[in-house]
Amino acid sequence: MVNLMNIKDIKLNADETKTTKAILKASFDMWLDIVEADVVIVGAGPSGLTCARYLAKEGFKVVVLERHLAFGGGTWGGGMGFPYIVVEEPADELLREVGIKLIDMGDGYYVADSVEVPAKLAVAAMDAGAKILTGIVVEDLILREDGVAGVVINSYAIERAGLHIDPLTIRSKVVVDATGHEASIVNILVKKNKLEADVPGEKSMWAEKGENALLRNTREVYPNLFVCGMAANASHGGYRMGAIFGGMYLSGKLCAELITEKLKNKE
């Protein structure tokens, strides 16, 4: 036990080579463990993190890939920079489960701190067993006869730099497009494989219709490929909702339930 009363007298053992070796060894061990997963979730926003938590709690090996260095999607900035988001009943219960503080605004509306929400959702997903990796972009999908079989990944920094460096892969039983407004994984699948499918993109804002459509649009859109959150609405031409997030969390939970049913039926 370190006596924190004498911090000035502590001598720290810091060696550059040992630091490098420790990071490399831990990283290789981690990558070797996750190159085969049950579920890969692309996008660490509100729906993706929620989906990851519930799947990990079921005992599945879950890997969440986020191209940016920060998880949380569009939650951090709240509404137009004001540091709160809105969640409506009954989705507030999903936030209470992870200890997020809510302020009752009446009429079934609550506000939550826009920094606290993604932080606690991410910690809860990791505590449940999910692995979250940032700075990783999914540039393609692995396909097999029975559908999607994993993701093709690269460093987002490499992509941004425009360097021609070949990617690596993660095999999985299921892939989830939780990329938000872009629905980028669905678009990759359709465009690269010349599928006869329409990805209409999202419509303008109509919060009530958008929120309710989320739960209808959260589904398996191609064998072993699911959509949740705003990617579900974008891939089905649903409306956007703005800074009200209840449907996003419920969509993530519903997606986890659908995947759980699919994977357990395969066993």
Curated annotation (Swiss-Prot):
**Residues that hold glycine according to the record:** 240
Keyword Cell inner membrane among UniProt keywords: no
What EC number(s) is this enzyme filed under? 2.4.2.59
Q: InterPro entries, alphabetically?
A: FAD/NAD-bd_sf (IPR036188), Thi4_fam (IPR002922), Thi4_prok (IPR022828)
Q: Which residues bind NAD(+)?
A: 47, 66-67, 74, 138, 164-166, 184, 230
The pathway noted for it is: Cofactor biosynthesis; thiamine diphosphate biosynthesis
Does this entry carry the keyword Cytoplasm? no
Q: What does the note accompanying the cofactor annotation read?
A: Binds 1 Fe(2+) ion per subunit. Other divalent metal cations can support activity.
One short Pfam family name for this protein? Thi4
Q: Which cofactor does it need?
A: Fe(2+)
Q: Which domain of life is it from?
A: Archaea
Keywords noted in UniProt: Iron, Metal-binding, NAD, Thiamine biosynthesis, Transferase
Give the family this protein belongs to, as stated in its UniProt record.
Answer: Belongs to the THI4 family.
Question: What does the UniProt record say this protein does?
Answer: Involved in the biosynthesis of the thiazole moiety of thiamine. Catalyzes the conversion of NAD and glycine to adenosine diphosphate 5-(2-hydroxyethyl)-4-methylthiazole-2-carboxylate (ADT), an adenylated thiazole intermediate, using free sulfide as a source of sulfur.
Miscellaneous: Unlike THI4 from S.cerevisiae, Thi4 from M.jannaschii can catalyze multiple turnovers because the sulfide is not enzyme derived.
What PANTHER family is this protein classified in? Answer: THIAMINE THIAZOLE SYNTHASE
**What protein is this chain from?**
Thiamine thiazole synthase
- Organism this protein belongs to: Methanocaldococcus jannaschii (strain ATCC 43067 / DSM 2661 / JAL-1 / JCM 10045 / NBRC 100440)
The taxonomy runs: Archaea, Methanobacteriati, Methanobacteriota, Methanomada group, Methanococci
